[in-house]
């Protein structure tokens, strides 16, 4: 066993780098004291959400309201002394300060009334901010303050009143803020600070893309968030492949986008040019019966003209047939995927107008395939090649899409472990006997955690491997497999029956059989075995998304004796009728783990104008027997290592092995 001095000597190179930040004993000792104090604070509040599916307005509201936490803080501070309507207005002001502030100011009859409202509002916001900042260090709060008004806000939040009257002190500062025309700015800054301090960490358990109108807005918000991680969903990885330039992934995301009449987002927000696709679609399919190709529509986003629906439907058909050709090519290149039964263009009997599905023959609903050569059904014609080339170029050159996908890679992974919670979107593939399913890729067998790690590594190849390399091609094909493959941990079903739903009338072929995991995760022993596979004790939790919980049918999101929580509650508007709710937020604070069930959100406009909030029901899952401190978290482990390193640095200074560059006791 090495002595302390031997360990310090071995770490001298690292300690010399650390000395750049702490150039003296005093500086290092001061940081040790601050860090050790931080360890004794309550752990920060973590929020978990999943399956956002582009529902930007509902997501923005839940983010702004901290899933109802901020309204709770408003009620705690103001209590019954302030009417319900006034508390609702104040909560809305915190959620949407830039939109709500002008409305509230207009109601003031004169300058005197406005000044009175300013004073009351600022004082109330200060009290709420003091409450949400109470479990943060002053240094942390100060770091969150805007430079333009940070000093004054720091004074208002941390003033002590042993030596002077609180009302007089606050009154003087607030009066000066109003007198100098800075009230609006301070109100907005306080609202933003309250939202910033209410939630420490945000975990998004997959599926940000598809179905909803504006995933780009969600990404822009997340990229500005102070601490977020993402566990990829199958709807995410296929967009990652599209951004990387994978033809099959590009066709797949466009097929989904057109199926939900959301191509406006692709064109206007990501700048993807669909003109060549539309021209080809009209050329080959413009006169077809497009009944089965009509998109899903949302009356809240209408109205839709016949011309709009036709344009969408004809492109939907064109991109689907192109996608089916490319699927066959990917399946041919990757026998490891074991998806040979999904090459449907080869399974069509062109004379009998039938198709073989799972060993049975079914009549086809649509037999118009003008771009398909029955002798070579997977070959692209010249027009399709041009369209595909233009689409790949457009996806690769979309600056915003590249930014969002790079963010997904930087902040995302197949799974994430933090503070005793295991997070993943889909499933840990299992057999019907309850063991981890084994799959072979590239000559090696993988199961359980090893399979998840392999999927993560190969998914990164698709974007980061050198252009034109076999590794990049392999990675892009695998991103498509993660979207729909039988043993994909992100999909977790036997097959994605897109072809059957479009072309086969018999609904028995539409079934997507869930992985046995979704039966076994009801067993506590199995959940504990999954946790053990990832190095976690049995008292930990699994946080899962992907499969909407049908609360309206009595299904519970709590599985496996409380070891697993499914947090896909149908956030997407398209699932509200199926689930009976509009999503969940799992909240893990220093005292409890609770699940908040959200009701549908009408609109941001109504939220601002009528103070409408998302109604949420809070269900306590676990209550801690003591308040969890930072030292008990993963962050605490990192901070303890930091203290250890700093103590070694102090000792290295004392031994003279590292020279102090600044001897300044003023840091004390």
Predicted regions and their residues:
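Feature recognizes metal-dependent phosphohydrolase scaffolds
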Residues: 1-668
């Amino acid at each position: 066993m090495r002595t302390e001095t031997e360990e310090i000597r071995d770490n001298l190179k690292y300690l010399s780098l650390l000395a750049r930040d702490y150039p003296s004993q005093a500086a290092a000792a001061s940081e040790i004291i601050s860090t050790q104090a931080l360890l004794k604070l309550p752990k920060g509040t973590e929020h978990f959400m999943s399956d956002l599916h582009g529902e930007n307005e509902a997501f923005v509201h839940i983010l702004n309201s901290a899933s109802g936490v901020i309204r709770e803080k408003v009620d705690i501070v103001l209590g019954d002394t302030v009417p319900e309507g006034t508390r609702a207005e104040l909560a809305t002001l915190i959620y949407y300060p830039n939109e709500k502030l002008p409305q509230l100011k207009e109601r003031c009859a004169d300058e005197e009334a406005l000044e009175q409202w300013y004073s009351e509002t600022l004082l109330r916001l200060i009290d709420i901010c003091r409450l949400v900042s109470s479990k943060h260090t002053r240094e942390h709060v100060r770091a969150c303050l805007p430079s333009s008004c940070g000093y004054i806000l720091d004074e208002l939040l941390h003033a002590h009143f042993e030596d002077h009257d609180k009302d007089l002190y606050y009154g003087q500062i607030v009066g000066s803020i109003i007198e100098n025309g800075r009230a609006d700015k301070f109100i907005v800054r306080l609202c933003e600070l309250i939202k910033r301090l209410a939630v420490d960490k945000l975990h998004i358990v997959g599926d940000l893309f598809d179905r909803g109108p504006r995933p780009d807005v969600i990404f822009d918000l997340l990229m500005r968030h102070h601490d977020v991680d993402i566990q990829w969903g199958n709807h995410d990885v296929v967009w990652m492949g599209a951004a990387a330039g994978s033809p099959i992934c590009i066709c797949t995301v466009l097929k989904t986008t057109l199926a939900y009449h959301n191509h406006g987002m692709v064109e206007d927000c990501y700048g993807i040019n669909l003109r060549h696709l539309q021209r080809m679609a009209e050329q080959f399919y413009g006169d077809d019966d497009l009944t089965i190709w009509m998109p899903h529509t949302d009356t809240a986003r209408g109205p839709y003209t016949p011309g709009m629906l036709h344009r969408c439907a004809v492109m939907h058909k064109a991109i689907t047939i192109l996608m089916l050709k490319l699927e066959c090519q990917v399946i041919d290149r990757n026998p490891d995927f074991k998806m040979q039964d999904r090459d449907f263009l080869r399974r069509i009997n062109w004379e009998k107008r039938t198709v073989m599905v799972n060993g049975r023959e079914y009549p086809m609903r649509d037999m118009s395939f003008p771009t398909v050569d029955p002798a070579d059904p997977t070959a692209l014609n010249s027009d399709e090649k041009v369209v595909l080339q233009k689409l790949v170029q457009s996806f690769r050159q979309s600056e915003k899409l590249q930014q969002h996908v790079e963010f997904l890679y930087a902040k995302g992974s197949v799974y994430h472990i933090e503070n005793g919670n295991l997070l993943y979107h889909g499933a840990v593939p299992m057999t019907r006997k309850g063991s981890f399913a084994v799959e072979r890729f590239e000559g090696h067998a993988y199961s359980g955690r090893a399979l998840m790690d392999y999927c993560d590594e190969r998914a990164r190849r698709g974007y980061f491997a050198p252009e034109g390399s076999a590794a990049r091609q392999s990675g892009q094909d695998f991103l498509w497999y993660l979207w729909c493959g039988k043993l994909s941990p992100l999909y977790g079903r036997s097959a994605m029956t897109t072809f059957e739903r479009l072309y086969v009338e018999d609904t028995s072929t539409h079934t997507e059989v869930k992985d046995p995991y979704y039966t076994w995760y009801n067993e506590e022993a199995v959940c504990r075995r999954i946790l053990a596979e990832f190095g976690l004790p049995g008292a930990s939790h699994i946080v899962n998304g992907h499969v909407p919980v049908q609360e309206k049918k009595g299904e519970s999101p709590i599985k496996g004796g409380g070891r697993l929580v499914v947090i896909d509650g149908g956030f997407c508007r398209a699932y509200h009728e199926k689930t009976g709710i509009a999503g969940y937020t799992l909240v893990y604070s220093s005292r409890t783990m609770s699940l908040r069930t959200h009701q549908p959100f009408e609109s941001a406009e109504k939220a601002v104008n009528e103070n409408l909030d998302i109604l949420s029901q809070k269900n306590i899952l676990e209550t801690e027997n003591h308040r969890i401190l930072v030292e008990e978290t993963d962050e605490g482990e990192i901070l303890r290592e930091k203290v250890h390193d700093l103590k070694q640095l102090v000792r290295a200074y004392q031994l003279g092995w590292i020279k102090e560059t600044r001897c300044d006791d003023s840091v004390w």
